[in-house]
């Protein structure tokens, strides 16, 4: 398709046909082809085509800004690498009243050759819509060099405490990788009792590509698990609140009491 575009006469094409081609190029993030097409469309006198050209310009500008942002995140990680594999690790589920705490560790190929090697939209998982997270989670799992997910359930949280469990999931997700990284960077917390060099980054999921990737796959994994739990325990709205203490959730606790996946050590103010 890309080679054919350079042979097309856009002046003889209908607006619909041009738009279909442009939409296809946007979908696959083919910036080079879009720039080529737009150079032609800018000279077209049709109003609809001129409007399309303006939309292409805006798309290209947004993508160029996104490329700069992503390269900054990748380059942030490279500062720690020093020719060794770097793992980013993050947890999700520290604060909910129910369900597990989950961490993911991810090793990315930070040596991008061009913008197509970057993960468009990669950022702190909390700033993404659910569908965006799911799409990125699939891409990260497919293209990451290595990744691993580890969880501890509510019973372990009640027995050992959330602070210990938080450290344990960060540690075990890292140690469960198929290779041992030269350094692991973590979001907000240093990892105790791990025999790998560790740097913790405040707001790391906004600064580091590797930590952001870990935060996304950890959150998608946990959210999916809570959706499955909602089918077993339907009263609490787990499919919407992921176990966090929303009004709906706390009212259900008062009405129905806790279910087997609730963290009893978290419920003193609710039951």
UniProtKB/Swiss-Prot annotation:
One of its GO terms (molecular function) is RNA-DNA hybrid ribonuclease activity. GO terms for cellular component: cytoplasm; ribonuclease H2 complex. A divalent metal cation binds at residues 90-91, 187. Gene3D superfamilies: Ribonuclease H-like superfamily/Ribonuclease H (3.30.420.10). Residues 84-271 form the RNase H type-2 domain. It is found in: Cytoplasm. Keywords: Cytoplasm, Endonuclease, Hydrolase, Manganese, Metal-binding, Nuclease. InterPro entries: RNase_HII, RNase_HII/HIII, RNase_HII/HIII_dom, RNaseH-like_sf, RNaseH_sf. Manganese or magnesium. Binds 1 divalent metal ion per monomer in the absence of substrate. May bind a second metal ion after substrate binding. Its EC number is 3.1.26.4. Coiled coil: none annotated. GO terms for biological process: DNA replication, removal of RNA primer; mismatch repair. Its cofactor is Mn(2+); Mg(2+). It catalyses: Endonucleolytic cleavage to 5'-phosphomonoester. Disulfide bonds: none annotated. It comes from the Bacteria. SUPFAM superfamilies: Ribonuclease H-like (SSF53098). PROSITE patterns: RNASE_H_2. Endonuclease that specifically degrades the RNA of RNA-DNA hybrids. Belongs to the RNase HII family. NCBIfam families: PRK00015.1-1, PRK00015.1-3. This is Ribonuclease HII. It comes from Clostridium tetani (strain Massachusetts / E88).
